[in-house]
């Protein structure tokens, strides 16, 4: 049986109260340390800057595994409560430009 690695590009968006803005600077650094990016190519291959609360990654992980990884890494941050939305890059741009 031949194994295939299927890679997908996901965009992770955070939603948090504005009072957490200083903590978000640490979160942003953490995301970059985990190889997330703030720029991603759209379906036409054009690089696009994501909004300030969004990050992209190309990975073989499933969306649920990405969320688990982020929440695990965030345990070192101060006790914050944030919503996390993970979608494929195509879904992100469809939602963003509709």
Curated annotation (Swiss-Prot):
A Pfam family assignment: GhoS
Post-translational modification: Unlike other TA proteinaceous antitoxins, this protein is stable with and without cellular stress; its structure has been determined in the absence of GhoT toxin.
MF GO annotations: RNA endonuclease activity
Function statement: Antitoxin component of a type V toxin-antitoxin (TA) system. Neutralizes the toxic effects of toxin GhoT by digesting ghoT transcripts in a sequence-specific manner. In concert with GhoT is involved in reducing cell growth during antibacterial stress. Overexpression leads to transcript level reduction of 20 other mRNAs involved in purine or pyrimidine synthesis and transport. Not seen to bind its own promoter DNA.
UniProt keyword annotation of Transcription present: yes
Encoding gene per record: ghoS
Record note on disruption phenotype: Essential; cannot be disrupted unless ghoT is also disrupted; in the double ghoS-ghoT mutant has no visible phenotype. Increased biofilm formation after 8 hours at 30 and 37 degrees Celsius, has risen higher by 24 hours at 37 degrees Celsius but has fallen by 24 hours at 30 degrees Celsius. Approximately 2-fold increase in swimming motility. When single ghoT mutant is grown in the presence of antibiotics carbenicillin or cefoxitin initial metabolism is significantly increased over that of wild-type, after 14 hours wild-type is slightly less active.
Outcome (variant: residue 26 to A): Slightly impaired digestion of ghoT RNA
Protein name, UniProt field: Endoribonuclease antitoxin GhoS
Keyword hit for S-adenosyl-L-methionine: no
Gene source species: Escherichia coli (strain K12)
Record annotation: effect of changing residue 15 to A: Still digests ghoT RNA
Enzyme class: hydrolase
EC number: 3.1.-.-
Induction / repression: Post-transcriptionally down-regulated by MqsR which acts on the ghoST transcript selectively, degrading the ghoS segment while leaving ghoT intact; conditions which induce MqsR (e.g. overexpression, nalidixic acid, azolocillin or H(2)O(2)) decrease ghoS expression and thus increase ghoT transcripts.
Misc. remarks from the entry: Has a similar 3D-structure to Cas2 proteins.
InterPro entries tied to this protein: GhoS (IPR022597), GhoS_sf (IPR038241)
Keywords associated with the record: Endonuclease, Hydrolase, Nuclease, Toxin-antitoxin system, Transcription, Transcription regulation
């Amino acid at each position: 049986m031949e194994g295939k690695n299927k890679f997908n590009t996901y965009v992770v968006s955070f939603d948090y109260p504005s009072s957490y803005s200083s903590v978000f600077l640490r979160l942003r650094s953490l995301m970059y340390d985990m190889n997330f990016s703030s720029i991603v190519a759209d379906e036409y291959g054009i690089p696009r800057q994501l909004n300030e609360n969004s990050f992209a990654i190309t990975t073989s992980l499933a969306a649920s595994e990405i969320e688990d990884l982020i929440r695990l890494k965030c345990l070192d941050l101060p006790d914050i409560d944030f919503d996390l939305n993970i979608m494929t890059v195509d879904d992100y741009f469809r939602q963003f430009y509709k």
